[in-house]
Amino acid sequence: MDMKKVQSTCNYCSIACNIDFNVEDNEIVSVVPTQGYPVNNGFCCIKGLNLDKQNTKFPNPVYPLVRGKDGEMEQISWDEAFKVMASKIKELQDKYGRESVAFISTGQLTTEEMALLGHIGRNYLGMNGDGNTRLCMATSVVAHKQSYGFDAPPYTFDDLELSDTLIFIGANPVVAHPILWTRVRNNKNNPKIIVIDPRQSETAIRADEWVDIKPKADLRLLYTLANYLIEKDWIDKDYIEKYTE
């Protein structure tokens, strides 16, 4: 049977990179990022490149996986998985205290699954728990609404290829957002890159200027910058009057 190309999108994040799946005999043979697609243009992160593994690496992806002695992932039964999870959690809590283990939810869970996770974690295991929204988009939504009056960033990836200065605050796109960083690398204006981060991250190493503030000092820095701009009268008063509250 001839090789068939099926074009689709990666479902791992909201960037929605375009992917070409090369299929033969109803089996995925290879995964290739789509050339010329405006979002990722022939590039995607390691997660997208391994999209086929969930269908081809294991004969039955419904069963849970555990890492074996050789470092490879192996399928086990659900009964085994429950016993391993319970024994490992109990072992850690007995050795280090109940607060030594915590759980974090995910936006992929249904409401019922989320309630069950919280019930077991808090009431039976005495664990601390949190939602993925603290690390994901919930905080961004609040900040975007307060800053721009809308719950989404007011820019596109194209801006990263056109800007002459780029500032990253607490972000490490070299590792955490390779698609975005690819757009930065495509910028032909040789932009100045400023990274504000306590960590000397991979992005900070590549920056023109690294501002290594103390942890939790980002708000203090931003308020100071805002105050300085106001004092120097370097703000666009007409724009602020028209578009902010």
Where are these regions (language model features)?
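N-terminal export/assembly segments and adjacent metallocofactor-ligating motifs
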Residues: M1-W234
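Internal, active-site/partner-interface "lid" segment
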Residues: D233-E245
